[in-house]
Amino acid sequence: MGAKEATVRGPGASPVHRTCHLIPLLLAGMLTTGLAQSPVPTSAPRGFWALSENLTVVEGSTVKLWCGVRAPGSVVQWAKDGLLLGPNPKIPGFPRYSLEGDSAKGEFHLLIEACDLSDDAEYECQVGRSELGPELVSPSVILSILVSPKVLQLTPEAGSTVTWVAGQEYVVTCVSGDAKPAPDIIFIQGGRTVEDVSSSVNEGSEEKLFFTEAEARVTPQSSDNGQLLVCEGSNPALATPIKASFTMNILFPPGPPVIDWPGLNEGHVRAGENLELPCIARGGNPPATLQWLKNGKPVSIAWGTEHAQAVAHSVLVMTVRPEDHGARLSCQSYNSVSAETQERSITLQVTFPPSAVTILGSTSQSENKNVTLCCLTKSSRPRVLLRWWLGGRQLLPTDETVMDGLHGGHISMSNLTLLVKREDNGLSLTCEAFSDAFSKETFKKSLTLNVKYPAQKLWIEGPPEGQSIRTGTRVRLVCLAIGGNPEPSLTWLKDSRPVNDPRQSQEPRRVQLGSVEKSGSTFSRELVLIIGPPDNLAKFSCKAGQLSASTQLVVQFPPTNLTILANSSALRPGDALNLTCVSISSNPPVNLSLDKEGERLDDVAAKPQSAPFKGSAASRSVFLRVSSRDHGHRVTCRAHSEALRETVSSFYRLNVLYPPEFLGEQVRAVTVVEQGQALLPVSVSANPAPEAFNWTFRGYRLSPAGGPRHRILSGGALQLWNVTRADDGFYQLHCQNSEGTAEALLKLDVHYAPTIRALKDPTEVNVGGSVDIVCTVDANPILPEMFSWERLGEDEEELNLDDMEKMSKGSTGRLRIRQAKLSQAGAYQCIVDNGVAPAARGLVRLVVRFAPQVDHPTPLTKVAAAGDSTSSATLHCRARGVPNIDFTWTKNGVPLDLQDPRYTEHKYHQGVVHSSLLTIANVSAAQDYALFKCTATNALGSDHTNIQLVSISRPDPPLGLKVVSVSPHSVGLEWKPGFDGGLPQRFQIRYEALESPGFLYMDVLPAQATTFTLTGLKPSTRYRIWLLASNALGDSGLTDKGIQVSITTPGLDQAPEDTDQPLPTEQPPGPPRLPLLPVLFAVGGLLLLSNASCVGGLLWRRRLRRLAEEISEKTEAGSEEDRIRNEYEESQWTGDRDTRSSTVSTAEVDPHYYSMRDFSPQLPPTLEEVSYRQAFTGIEDEDMAFPGHLYDEVERVYGPPGVWGPLYDEVQMDPYDLRWPEVKYEDPRGIYDQVAADMDAGEPGSLPFELRGHLV
């Protein structure tokens, strides 16, 4: 590499070789960001074969400082401003520094990547002392880093548009960012360099950095408008200068305005012409504002601008008028920087004709007299000449005159005097104006000459004078005249006063005045009259100039005004009244008469008065004494005319002042249904009308302004709504006027639906006794037949009440029951309907008391239990009766001591059914295998049953085997289980076909089933069927092999049979007489058996003990399991001790036996399965706890339907809702004094329970 060259490598570019000049700050070839290698001097110092010279690079470049050592084995390191960097090629603390080259060749070049200002320093290459050479230090190499300015800050702001006024001086400031060396700044204005610039260099934000601040003084011109003013900064680190600029908006005035009009210099224009004057102003920023002035006053301020050409234009459009003569029109231009307004003007010279020609003077004149006229024109420019014409004949004027007119014009005047004759009448007299300047136009004024002369004749046509005409008649009068100029006006007069056509429309119009009509030389005018009294003897005249004609009418009319006069206006009962009837005027006279409401009154004649319309007057008087009944009556006066056959009437209404009086039709009582509306009407007469209607109820005054449920109507009537029973009663009305007061009582009768107030529930009676079920209600009205009764059975079925007596008195109804029977017990419903919905309904129970009836099947009930003192037994005694039953127990006739801890009794009362469960713990064969007697007692008697407690044994044979269905291949069987011996039993069917010997067996599954269908049979075959029961101790009926039936299956062509009747049970035939040999064998067998009895007895006792232990364990486990699983929550029990127990009840005609293994008898699902706490009263609340299913299974021990019959007709209730039906009756314990207004109108369920009407 040459000593005067450096290599610069930019990113992604090939190396570029430039000549290196050693002048500071002018190393343009080094201003890149690539690798810079310092030039190596041609003659290196001692010990070095290569060293770099001073180097200048741009910030961000990579530079290599050369160091070639002649003693390669020495330790070499670089020093930066005296700081040793160390011999390590990866220089610690300087990640951008590294040593490059082959150390064996003595190459220790320092490589600096991405140079920044911190690398601007002096560098030395130092060689340590070694065996090969001494310690060496190279001359210093100065590395200069050039930093370019990043930004120029221009004031005003760069990128903006700056508005200046042309010719004014402005200051622009430009400040560079930090750089090294300081940048140079110049200003360029519109492509020209600004000379007046001052700059200063200042220290930058860091050491070795500088910034330049330059200030330029600029005076813009109009040519600079829209140009850029640029600040340009440069330094050696920049390849191209950086710039900042703003746009100059130079304001300067526009050029002078120009009016583009051909007649600009002369200004000649014709009046009426539409003149358009364009004005243009060029240049200016902003563009010029133009306006037009007329005689110094603005007339148009509208203008347009073409920005591209910088031209403003405005057009003045005007219609020239005569007054515009001599007007000065000016166009002015200016903008915001104009020193003064620029103006261009024009003066108008207007030519205009006269706007009008006028003839002064009258053209109407009597014949043979002179007419003097003057013709005058309006101002014109230039002047005009005048001439006269009469018809087609030109007349000579008397004289002519010219005067100055308006707007620089002239006025012409011509006078004319003319003698008129009759033949000149109607000719046209014309004044004409003319001039050469207006040769195409004619201006003239014409008048018609009117020569006056009088008419020749005048007369009236109409009815003949003296003829009588009835008022209201339409009369036509016509006035006629011949000749005359002007045409005769024909004026009508009545009694010397002009007759005018009325302006306002009248139906019909009494006067219709026609217009003058002409027919040839005859003129006429019609006057039509509807004749009235004012026209009587009136004189109607017609005038035409000095001529006149007249006629007179005679009118017949009835009284024009018939008036009754009274001597007093304020009358009170007993006052005297004098009335006078006066007929003002009529023609001919009339006859007067007076009556009151059709009754003729005695009257006397009164002194007549003068009558208008030249008619006759009349008057008569009458005397009256008035009462309150006369108020409003009319006294009528009638005036009758015989000639006219017409009567005119007038009346006087009597105004009698009297206090209020209630009329006979006044209502005294009003009926209304509760919650409805009521109107208490008022029929009162008073004069003046009552001032107030005051209503009081129970001593309290009702507000006249109204209330929530009442208002007083304008006529005094009282209106009520949402009426309640509390509103029932008398209402007092107090009426008052200025004459006095009056009072009346009105009764309001409020009808409301019945409400049951008392209904005793339950109602009790002994069997055979008599009782009344009493139902007391609150209702209005109380009707004799409003009570009815129903007896309810199951599902509220209505039953017959023919054996009961119904009666009622007032608000109480009774249902009388005589010789009460158990079948009459149950629910009864009292229904009350008084015609106001809804009807009231109340439920009541009739309880018929009877002595206990114990369920005691015959001949005996057995209960089995192991007698080894390890098990327990429960005896169940059930009875019916009312009232509640008490139970007692005996064993073998001896009262049972229930204080003994081995005995526990639980009592259960459910309606009429009562139960006692006696549990015996640790059953002992010696003590407890006995006959127990249960006695049920109440106030009406007692009853008892016996229960035998026995030991565990084989089961008894089943009972009642019968066939329920038969088919060709099957037979359906049903039976009743016998005593199971205290152990679980199962059933087995043995059968045989009689045609084919041999027995077949079939086990019944499930084991506890009591019905079974035997299949696999042959059609048309006779079978014999046996049923056996067995338990762990053996089979039932081993001697006779159980009970049996015989059947014959039908053929395939026969229909299957269903039967509910048991077939005859076929017993095995009796044994034949025993022969001797078999008897001997039997005796021998007995002897053998006697020898083995001891061994067999012992074995039997052991086996029995083991069975008892197993049964006891299983029974206890089963009882505990049932207790946990089947707790009965709603039962009512009585127990002496808190022990679990079971129940046994006897109701079969056959003996039944119960074991203690898994024993859980249960009652049938009757009323005793649910609690009657909500439906019955008087039931004992007793604590009882035993397995919940205790009563479901005992149903099988009761007799079949019909064996016992119904002991008590019980009301069936929903087991899930033990309330009586809510809407069927009213609560007998309700609050009696409530009224409907105080009750909640919500649903029944929203009331408290005690107000819902439920039986509890």
Swiss-Prot record:
Residue ranges, Extracellular compartment? Answer: 36-1078
Glycosylation sites (chain numbering): N54, N370, N415, N561, N578, N591, N722
GO cellular component entries: cell periphery; cell projection; focal adhesion; membrane; plasma membrane; slit diaphragm
Q: Where is the segment annotated Disordered? A: 491-516, 1048-1071, 1112-1143
Ranges of compositional bias, category Basic and acidic residues:
494-510, 1112-1128
Modification sites for Phosphotyrosine: Y1208
| Residues with the Phosphothreonine modification | T1115
Q: What is this protein called?
A: Nephrin
This protein's species is: Mus musculus (Mouse)
